[in-house]
Swiss-Prot record:
Species of origin: Escherichia coli O139:H28 (strain E24377A / ETEC)
Gene3D superfamilies: Class II aldolase/adducin N-terminal domain
Pathway note: Carbohydrate degradation; L-rhamnose degradation; glycerone phosphate from L-rhamnose: step 3/3
Positions with a binding annotation for Zn(2+): 141, 143, 212
Taxonomic lineage: Bacteria, Pseudomonadati, Pseudomonadota, Gammaproteobacteria, Enterobacterales
Catalytic reaction list: L-rhamnulose 1-phosphate = (S)-lactaldehyde + dihydroxyacetone phosphate
Cofactor(s) this protein requires: Zn(2+)
SMART domains: Aldolase_II
Family named by the database record: Belongs to the aldolase class II family. RhaD subfamily.
Gene: rhaD
Record keywords, A-Z: Cytoplasm, Lyase, Metal-binding, Rhamnose metabolism, Zinc
Protein known as: Rhamnulose-1-phosphate aldolase
Length: 274
């Protein structure tokens, strides 16, 4: 019998959650991570599944995700502990045939349930499936320190925030030319913040929750982690720059345009226009 804890997707979740913990992005039970799978990914591990999978209804049906398996982090679980006990802190779930709920096939032992932000994740998965023709498979939420810090001092506007991050590090425009969506402050763990996040995910692979954290989307765990890491590195540079009295010189609009042309990306027009 193959052990599911040795599968690429469990091992990938262990690495991503451990790396995020070591970065300082996921204190206590902060942060959550979901990865969309295919039936072929989980088929070799059916002998590991619960004999009687628990069923949990969704707060709203999501027919686009019908019959789709995911691996998810658990509610109240600490990222630092995933590596110690994957079955207690992660779960493989599968949405039912009408998208009204899901079964917990593996993991989330001792009656644990998926992250409280699952509505935000699933709604964002729906939008990124449509926006990327199914390429994006990962939604990651974390409390990236410097990005959060900037939401207290920068105007919480997509164009303004995006332009500052592009100027903070040359690679940013190449990595997220679509910019950073920003919400108003909202209560987490609700359908409302999930819907607002998903709406921004139609246009952006990064969405900031002011005074709270960031959501990122990508095709793989590495791509998604790298996306957030790149934005966070720029935010760290900006925090240092602002603390030293602000910018005396920076990347110009003309240079940003040249950068986009060189790497074949189309920068967010509203950010470029500032």
């Amino acid at each position: 019998m193959q052990n599911i804890t040795q599968s690429w997707f469990v091992q990938g979740m262990i690495k991503a959650t451990t790396d995020a913990w070591l970065k300082g992005w996921d204190e206590r039970n902060g942060g959550n991570l979901t990865l969309r799978l295919d039936d072929a990914d989980i088929a070799p591990y059916k002998d590991n599944f619960h004999a009687q999978p628990r069923y949990i209804p969704l707060s709203q049906p999501m027919p686009l995700l019908a019959n789709t398996p995911f691996i998810v982090t658990g509610s109240g679980k600490f990222f630092r502990n995933v590596q110690l006990d994957p079955a207690a802190n992660l779960g493989v779930v599968k949405v039912d045939s009408d998208g009204a709920g899901y079964h917990i096939l593996w993991g989330l032992t001792n009656e644990a349930v998926p992250t409280s932000e699952l509505p935000a994740h699933f709604l964002s998965h729906c939008e990124r499936i449509k926006a990327t023709n199914g390429k994006d498979r990962v939604i990651m939420h974390c409390h990236a320190t410097n990005l959060i810090a900037l939401t207290y001092v920068l105007e919480n506007d997509t164009a303004v925030f995006t332009r500052q991050l592009w100027e903070g590090s040359t690679e940013c425009l190449v990595v997220f030319p679509d910019g950073v969506g920003i919400l108003p402050w909202m209560v987490p763990g609700t359908d409302e913040i999930g819907q607002a996040t998903a709406q921004e995910m139609q246009k952006h692979s990064l969405v900031l929750w002011p005074f709270h954290g960031v959501f990122g989307s990508g095709s793989t765990l590495d791509e998604t982690f790298g996306l957030i890491d790149t934005a966070e590195k720029s935010a760290q540079v900006l925090v240092k720059v602002y603390s030293m009295g602000g910018m005396k010189q920076t990347i110009s609009r003309e240079e940003l345009i040249a950068l986009g042309k060189r790497f074949g990306v189309t920068p967010l027009a509203s950010a470029l226009a500032l």
